[in-house]
């Protein structure tokens, strides 16, 4: 079954488990957990992905990481984001 999966990511992601925050351009935001990350995107978990804006900034304070991004898919509490 796995041989039929087509990988669409531009870069391999690395498994992590880090606390983060999605900072919205209107000043709001939500906490998240970063599950994997690459130079081009990440998979994050949020309490409720409904209502996420079209773009936001992913912050990982422990790594001094800040990157504009946008969601490309979501399933339950999982969200895939692409970096801008």
Model-derived segments and spans:
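N-terminal helix initiation/capping motif
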Residues: 1-35
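Short alpha-helix capping/helix-loop boundary micro-motifs
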Residues: 6-10, 40-46
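Short conserved beta-strand and strand-loop elements enriched in small hydrophobics
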Residues: 18-23, 53-62
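Short, conserved beta-turn/loop elements at beta-strand boundaries and strand-helix junctions
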Residues: 25, 39-40, 74-78
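Short acidic/polar mixed-charge low-complexity motifs
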Residues: 26-30, 63-65, 77
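Short beta-strand-centered aromatic/proline hotspots
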Residues: 31-34, 67-72
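Short, solvent-exposed secondary-structure boundary/capping segments
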Residues: 42-46, 77-84
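Short, surface-exposed beta-strand-loop junctions and turns on beta-sheet-rich folds
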Residues: 50-52, 74
């Amino acid at each position: 079954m796995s041989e039929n999966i087509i990988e669409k990511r531009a870069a391999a992601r690395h498994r992590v488990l880090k606390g983060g925050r999605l900072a919205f351009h209107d000043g709001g935001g939500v906490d998240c957990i970063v599950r994997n990350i690459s130079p081009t995107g990440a998979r994050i978990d949020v309490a409720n992905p409904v209502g996420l804006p079209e773009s936001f900034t992913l912050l990982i304070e422990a790594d001094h990481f800040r990157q504009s991004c946008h969601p490309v898919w979501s399933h339950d509490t999982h969200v895939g984001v692409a970096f801008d």
